[in-house]
Structure formats: structure tokens, C-alpha cells
A protein has these predicted regions:
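Active-site beta-strand termini and strand-to-loop segments that position acidic
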Residues: 43-47, 109-114, 124
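Conserved catalytic-core motifs of GNAT/GCN5-like acyltransferases
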Residues: 7, 27-38, 96-101, 123-128
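Short, charged/polar surface micro-motifs in flexible loops or helix N-caps
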Residues: 46-50, 58, 75-81
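Core segments of cupin and vicinal oxygen chelate
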Residues: 8-49
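N-terminal beta-strand motif that seeds the catalytic metal site of vicinal oxygen chelate
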Residues: 1-17, 69-72, 125-128
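Conserved beta-strand in the GNAT
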Residues: 51-54, 110, 120
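Acetyl-CoA-dependent GNAT
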Residues: 54-59, 124-127
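Vicinal oxygen chelate
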Residues: 13, 72-118
Length: 128
């Protein structure tokens, strides 16, 4: 058994792709319109696990604080550098960090994507 993908509703597919593909460097792998009339776009990093972004103008996203989704973690080489670069190049909000997480043996930071979804940037560190 393996995780294949996670699906997230978004308000603007192009803005979402600009962030995840353009700024974070993930790869767009597929796109189609589903039976629910939603535009579905898939992206992934180096692993086979994908993120599915769904958009339908008739779908109410709700407020970020009322969603049950907590966060998405993305591995990076340099948390501090990525935070600095993303804050310069995008409208992302830094929620917490960068900080050392000794329990996770990583340097982490929490930011937002264009729809307010929380993204954890994770730099694995053996020295923590």
C-alpha cells in the first residue's frame, strides 16, 4: 500500500501553479476536467506522490481556519534560503520559523500558499 496523491481545492489554478511549479519547482504531471466539472491539475517533486489541485468556480473553499486540512510538508535543501527567496518572489506569508525541530531532526518553516494552505518547508538535518 502506498499514498498516491492528496487533493486540495484551490481558488485559482494558474496562481497555484505559479507558486508550486514556478516558485517551489515542482513538476506539473497531468491535467483534466473531471465528472464534477472541476479542473484537476497534478504536480509532484522527486517522489511519485502527487498533489492534486481541484478548481470549480461553484465550489466554496471556506475560510482556511475552518478547513480540516492542516499542512503539506515539502522537503527543501535550505529552509532559510527558501523562506527568503519565496518572500522576495511571492506573496507567501511566513507563519513560523525558520526553526530547528529536534524531534523531527530538521530545520523547518511554515508558510502559506496563495489560498492560505499551510506549507511546511523541511530541511532534514542529521546534526539536530
Amino acid at each position: 500500500m502506498d499514498v498516491i496523491h492528496s487533493a486540495i481545492w484551490v481558488s485559482d489554478v494558474e496562481e497555484t501553479l505559479d507558486f508550486y511549479v514556478g516558485a517551489l519547482g515542482l513538476e506539473k504531471t497531468n491535467e483534466f476536467v473531471g465528472g464534477d466539472d472541476a479542473r484537476n491539475v497534478y504536480v509532484r517533486g522527486e517522489s511519485e506522490t502527487e498533489i492534486q489541485f481541484k478548481h470549480n468556480p461553484d465550489h466554496d473553499l471556506g475560510e482556511p481556519s475552518t478547513r480540516r486540512f492542516d499542512h503539506l510538508a515539502i522537503e527543501v535543501d535550505d529552509t532559510d534560503g527558501e523562506v527568503e527567496r519565496l518572500r522576495e518572489e511571492t506573496d507567501t506569508e511566513l507563519l513560523r520559523g525558520p526553526l530547528d525541530s529536534t524531534g523531527a531532526s530538521a530545520r523547518v518553516a511554515f508558510i502559506t500558499d496563495p489560498d492560505g494552505h499551510v506549507i511546511e518547508l523541511v530541511e532534514p538535518r542529521e546534526d539536530l
